[in-house]
C-alpha cells in the first residue's frame, strides 16, 4: 500500500465508486477552532480555509492540520466523540489511517484508528458537514466516502 507524502493538500470529497467525478466538488473547509469541519466548494470565501498539512507519524498514521493564515494555534481533524454521524471537529489534531483506494494514486479513505467491534470509523460528508461514518470491516456496506488529496 502506497503511503501519502507529507505536504500541504486540499481534500476533496469523493467516493470509492467515483474517485474522479470531474470539475467542482466539495472540499474540507475549516470554520474555526472547536467548530465542525465543513464541505464547501473551492471558491471564495472558502478557498483560503481549505489548505491542510498532512504529516505521517512514526507509527504510520497521519495528522491532518489546518495550514491557513492567521491560525492562533494548531488545530486539525479531531473529534469529541466517535459516534455514527458525529462531526469532525477542528481541534487538537488526532491521528488517522489513510487507506489508498485501489486503482488510484491520490484518493484515500480516512479512518479513525479506533477499534469498534465489526466496524471501521471513516470520515465522510453529510449535508455540508464532515462526519464519522461506520462501515463493516469485511468491506461490505456499499460505496464508501473517500478523499482526493491534491497537492498545493
Swiss-Prot record:
This is Clitocypin-4/-3. InterPro entries: Prot_inh_I48_clitocypin. It comes from the Eukaryota. It comes from Clitocybe nebularis. The gene is clt4. One of its GO terms (molecular function) is cysteine-type endopeptidase inhibitor activity. Binds and inhibits cysteine proteinases. Inhibits most strongly papain and cathepsin L, more weakly bromelain and cathepsin B while it is completely ineffective against cathepsin H. The keyword Transcription regulation does not apply. Coiled coil: none annotated. The keyword Metal-binding does not apply.
Amino acid at each position: 500500500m502506497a503511503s501519502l507524502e507529507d505536504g500541504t493538500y486540499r481534500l476533496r470529497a469523493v467516493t470509492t465508486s467515483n474517485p474522479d467525478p470531474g470539475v467542482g466538488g466539495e472540499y474540507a473547509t475549516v470554520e474555526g477552532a472547536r467548530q465542525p469541519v465543513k464541505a464547501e466548494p473551492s471558491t471564495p470565501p472558502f478557498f483560503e480555509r481549505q489548505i491542510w498539512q498532512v504529516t505521517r507519524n512514526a507509527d504510520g498514521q497521519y495528522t491532518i492540520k489546518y495550514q491557513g493564515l492567521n491560525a492562533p494555534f494548531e488545530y486539525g481533524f479531531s473529534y469529541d466523540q466517535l459516534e455514527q454521524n458525529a462531526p469532525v471537529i477542528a481541534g487538537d489534531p488526532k491521528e488517522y489511517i489513510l487507506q489508498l483506494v485501489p486503482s488510484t494514486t491520490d484518493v484515500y479513505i480516512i479512518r479513525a484508528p479506533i477499534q469498534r467491534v465489526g466496524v471501521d470509523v471513516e470520515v465522510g460528508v453529510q449535508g455540508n458537514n464532515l462526519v464519522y461514518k461506520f462501515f463493516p470491516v469485511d468491506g461490505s456496506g456499499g460505496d464508501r466516502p473517500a478523499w482526493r488529496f491534491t497537492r498545493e
